[in-house]
Regions:
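Compact, glycine/acidic-enriched structural inserts
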Residues: 161-187
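Intrinsically disordered or highly flexible coil/loop and linker segments, enriched in small
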Residues: 23, 27, 142, 189-193
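Long, compositionally biased interface segments
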Residues: 180-229
Length: 229
């Protein structure tokens, strides 16, 4: 799903969702976007990882931000009104995007621990998904969102499940920048897979033009033109 990266539009989408969630009575945290990383800072982390970061991720750190935090929660709304969410969106309760150069080594240490302790067999189809990835976001339930390092699908964004989800190994964007744009366009719902799954379209990944995405916008009083989809 070809998507043009526009950092200003990306930030606009994040702020719009925070505004709409607040209007409905949900909880939010201020959007945190730190200054870009330096080439020296990136190379220092790459030296410890033993490889060059995937290009879209690397460019994002150098050109846009070295650390970003975005979060909202609607549990208070759904506790008060159990029918607030339609059935197809009923699993949604929060949104989060949290990545940073400063977090990368810790995330990778944790992912590698899963590989060593639980999923060591590269010849096992499920285990193999955990291998040769670069995790950039740790999901609250223990899963990860990562970037593929295997040559065949290098650079794609992939979901890593620790507990047998059918979405384990699912590619949700062709690259990191596409992921940012499309994930922001649905409010970074998740990151647990069952929260963003309603917006997944086979062959497109997270799809802000999907029927469920349009229903989500309507629920939050968002005009899709505001998102410039």
């Amino acid at each position: 799903m070809a998507t043009t990266f526009n950092f200003e539009l990306f930030k606009k989408r994040l702020n719009l969702f925070l505004e709409k969630i607040e209007d409905l009575g949900g909880a939010t945290e201020p959007l945190t976007i730190e200054k870009p990383a330096t080439e020296e800072e990136v190379k220092a982390v790459e030296a410890q990882l033993g490889y060059t970061l995937p290009p879209h991720f690397r460019e994002g750190l150098l050109e846009n931000t070295a650390h970003l935090e975005f979060w909202w929660d609607i549990n208070d709304i759904t506790d008060e009104d159990e029918d607030f969410l339609p059935e197809e969106l009923a699993e949604i309760f929060c949104g989060e995007l949290l990545f940073g150069l400063d977090l990368l080594l810790g995330y990778e240490e944790s992912r590698k621990s899963w590989v060593e302790d639980v999923y060591p067999d590269y010849n096992n189809k499920y285990d193999r998904v955990w291998h040769n990835k670069m995790s950039f976001q740790q999901v609250g339930n223990g899963d990860y969102i990562a970037i593929e390092l295997e040559p065949e699908n290098y650079g794609k964004v992939v979901y890593l499940s620790h507990d047998g989800s059918e979405n384990h190994g699912l590619y949700i964007a062709d690259n990191f920048k596409e992921f940012l744009m499309n994930y922001a366009a649905v409010g970074c719902t998740g990151g647990e897979d069952w929260q963003w799954e309603p917006f997944y379209t086979k062959g497109k990944g997270i799809d802000p033009t999907s029927e469920n995405a349009l229903a989500w916008y309507k629920l939050l009083n968002i005009n899709e033109k505001e998102l410039d989809i």
